[in-house]
Amino acid sequence: QSPLVFRLARAPGINKILRYVTPRFFIKNTLKEVYYDKTKLTDKKIDTYRDLILRENNRESFINRTNSSPVDYTQRLKSIIIPAQIIWGNEDEWISVDNAKLFSEALPNNRVDIMKETGHLPMEERPYESLELFLNFINEN
């Protein structure tokens, strides 16, 4: 089942309301789904996300993107020949870590790094560890 925020963005009527009303608690609850370590979810971070979503056209763009038809990029991924890094949180509640394997199979020249005790946003939840993985990848390639 897809995350609540996406289900609401697809719901006729509700998605029209979401274009104009985005309560702070809604942002907070959505972020709780993507963070494994809830202690990293500060009031400042919640406010930053709310400020971003409230910017002109952002809500409309999110709803439009959520309601667009899915596209299968598998063949296009297979054509990428440069080294690619896949970083995934093993506790991602939005997109299962099993999908890292699918990306790995589609990308011919890749490295997969699975981060333990990490949710959907490794680069925010564990920025220093994410940076270390990224720099190691860059140095190796």
Language model feature labels by segment:
Residues K101-N110:
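Active-site-adjacent alpha-helix of alpha/beta-hydrolase-fold enzymes
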Residues I80, I86-W88, D92:
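Short beta-strand/loop motif that positions the catalytic acidic residue
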